[in-house]
Swiss-Prot record:
The keyword Ribosomal protein applies. Binds as a heterodimer with protein bS6 to the central domain of the 16S rRNA, where it helps stabilize the platform of the 30S subunit. GO terms for molecular function: small ribosomal subunit rRNA binding; structural constituent of ribosome. Pfam families: Ribosomal_S18. Keywords: Ribonucleoprotein, Ribosomal protein, RNA-binding, rRNA-binding. PROSITE patterns: RIBOSOMAL_S18. InterPro entries: Ribosomal_bS18, Ribosomal_bS18_CS, Ribosomal_bS18_sf. HAMAP family: Ribosomal_bS18 (MF_00270). Belongs to the bacterial ribosomal protein bS18 family. One of its GO terms (cellular component) is cytosolic small ribosomal subunit. This is Small ribosomal subunit protein bS18. One of its GO terms (biological process) is translation. Part of the 30S ribosomal subunit. Forms a tight heterodimer with protein bS6.
Amino acid sequence: MARFFRRRKFCRFTAEGVKEIDYKDLNTLKAYISETGKIVPSRITGTKARYQRQLATAIKRARYLALLPYTDSHGR
């Protein structure tokens, strides 16, 4: 019987040595947003709590400045 091995989650920001997450770095922020526009939780992405807080703040700032959409599905 084959066993299913789940891939180990790791924090990308810790591995790359990132100090602060910038709200202008849209490519990074888009990786942590679902297709409906919600922020993906850290239990799914493996991001550490410190960086998850920075990520949420950066995404909210980018949304406020209209760099990112609040939702992707407007009346479909």
